[in-house]
Regions:
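Mature catalytic core of soluble alpha/beta enzymes
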Residues: 4-8, 12, 23-340
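Short amphipathic, basic-aromatic surface patches that mediate peripheral association
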Residues: 345-357
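Short coil-to-beta strand junction motifs in C2/discoidin
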Residues: 356-362, 436
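Beta-strand signatures of extracellular beta-sandwich domains
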Residues: 363-367
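Glycine-centered tight-turn motifs at strand-turn-strand junctions
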Residues: 385-428
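Short acidic/polar inter-strand loop motif in beta-rich domains
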Residues: 412-414, 427-432, 444-452
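A short tyrosine-centered beta-strand micro-motif
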Residues: 418-420, 432-442
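Short beta-strand elements
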Residues: 450-483
Length: 483
């Protein structure tokens, strides 16, 4: 008989082995998955982790045969090849239904009915000859007018002159379904992450209950060795990005975006890129695409109106605009302290006596002590001709990225007192350390004067607050305080 100590040691080693197997984090990397790469991590017992890997790959392969517009043997390609009513699989019917929901939500700016336009641009790339604007407008008009009936289980007829292209949300849908397959195959799993080409769904929390730390790449031109714009902390959330630089059509020597204007059929120019966090990858994928064609202000309003959604939008030149929930996702960074309270700036548009009064164009922003911009808070006035009459603001923001500025600018305001708040973050949503800054206000009026105020503040321990300044002509009283 073995000594009792030896037996206890054997039991201890066996238990450690079993616990180690249960806590094992299996990782899988595959290239050439949906035309890009796949990375899967699953915290589960070894046998379940292997089963989950197989389930993920099988589900991706199955849905690729359903949703791909690049495969002649896919269900989508067969549906596009005929105008006769066809019975559709549950997945294709679901995806087309989601496309229609997003088309309605964005008033047509997001559309899966533009397959004929994508096909025409593919032909242009192969021939080296650009399509005519009129030809594209005809195809775009047909896509915009398309009516798709998916209300019941009856066969579906494809509208004539319309081809479906579901790429704008298909990858997100596949990620969600593949993650569900992994969870079913590994019921003991405690955490799963599935990343396909940079779009990903993170289930539960990373090891030891910590949030998944996910770097946000510059969607305008992602590079493998590029530092992250930010790091977000995700728990059972998905993330997706949409940009214009890395995909598209090359006709002759010129590169065109793969994201097409739904009204003209022409590739988007000077358009923003976006990164979206949502509860599921399908929504994140669809909204990221939508934000790439929507005016920036409208896109931010849409993101803020949707529950559990946050977005970071980058203009064509890199100016950042974040939705209300974005800052809360940012992972804490060493050495940074969030300003404990917001600063409130009450500003006045003065009442002037004038035979032909025009409300002033006005910009209000936060700057470093040297004048370099930190955070753009307000732009009033939507015509570029008069925005240029704000020279301080124009040099720092407007002239480099006018399309983006026009996307967030609001109408001018009549005389009165108004308020704007600053949450202590920069244009990308990153928390800034307490210290000295400047509140910059500039106003100009058509047929009137111009005025610029620069008020020093110190957010460290509230020194010097509240403070106020008084303009002499186009700007009235300015008061800066904590709420």
């Amino acid at each position: 008989m073995k000594p009792i100590s030896t037996l206890l040691l054997a039991i201890f080693v066996t238990l450690c082995t079993l616990l180690g197997a249960a806590a094992r984090a299996a990782e899988l990397h595959r290239d050439d998955v949906l035309g890009t790469s796949l990375d899967l991590r699953i915290d589960a017992p070894a046998d379940q982790a292997m089963a989950a890997e197989r389930a993920v790959l099988a589900e991706i392969a199955r849905l690729d045969v359903v949703l791909s517009r690049w495969r002649e043997d896919s269900e989508l390609s067969r549906f596009n090849a005929s105008v006769e009513p066809q019975d559709l699989s549950r997945d294709l019917r679901t995806v087309l239904g989601l496309c229609e929901e997003w088309r309605a939500r964005t008033e047509g700016l997001f559309s899966c009915c533009m397959g004929a336009l994508a096909q025409r641009w593919q032909q242009a790339q192969e021939s080296g000859l650009l399509p005519t604007r009129e030809e594209l407008r005809v195809l775009a008009s047909a896509a915009a007018a398309a009516e798709v009936s998916l209300d019941d289980s009856r066969p579906v007829a494809r509208p004539q002159a319309v081809l479906f292209d579901v790429d704008a949300l298909a990858k997100g849908y596949i990620i969600d379904r593949a993650l569900a397959a992994a969870r079913a195959a590994a019921p003991a799993a405690t955490a799963i992450s599935l990343d396909i080409g940079g779009d990903a769904h993170y289930w539960q929390s990373s090891g030891a209950g910590e949030a998944w730390q996910v770097g946000v790449a510059d969607a305008r031109a992602p590079r493998d060795n590029q530092p992250a714009l930010a790091t977000v902390a995700l728990r059972s959330q998905a993330i997706a990005s949409s940009g214009h630089a890395t995909r598209g059509y090359t006709v002759g020597r010129r590169h065109y975006s793969h994201i097409l204007d739904p009204w003209s059929g022409w590739p988007m120019q000077f358009a923003p890129s976006a990164t979206v966090v949502a509860a599921d990858a399908t929504s994140a994928d669809a909204l990221a695409t939508a934000l790439s064609v929507m005016p920036i202000r409208s896109g931010l309003e849409l993101a803020d109106a949707m529950p559990k959604v946050a977005a970071l939008i980058l203009s064509d030149t890199g100016t950042a605009f974040s939705s209300q929930r974005w800052p809360a996702l940012l992972a804490a960074e060493a050495g940074q302290t969030v300003v404990p309270e917001q600063l409130v700036m009450d500003y006045e548009v003065p009442r002037l006596v004038s035979d032909r009064y025009h409300a002033p164009y006005l910009a209000l922003w936060i700057a470093h002590q040297d004048g370099s911009p930190v955070r753009q808070l307000l732009v009033l006035g939507e015509r570029s001709r008069y925005l240029q009459d704000l020279p301080q603001w124009w040099r720092r923001y407007g002239r480099d990225d006018l399309p983006a500025i026009q996307g967030i600018a609001r109408p001018t305001r009549m005389p009165g007192r108004y308020s704007v708040a600053w949450d202590g973050r920069d244009d990308r949503g990153q928390a800034l350390p307490p210290g000295p800054y400047r509140v910059q206000v500039e106003a100009a009026r058509q047929g009137g004067g111009h005025e610029f105020l620069s008020v020093p503040i110190d957010t460290g321990q509230g020194r010097g607050l509240p403070t106020q300044a008084q303009g002499s002509s186009e700007i009235g009283a300015l008061q800066i305080s904590r709420p």
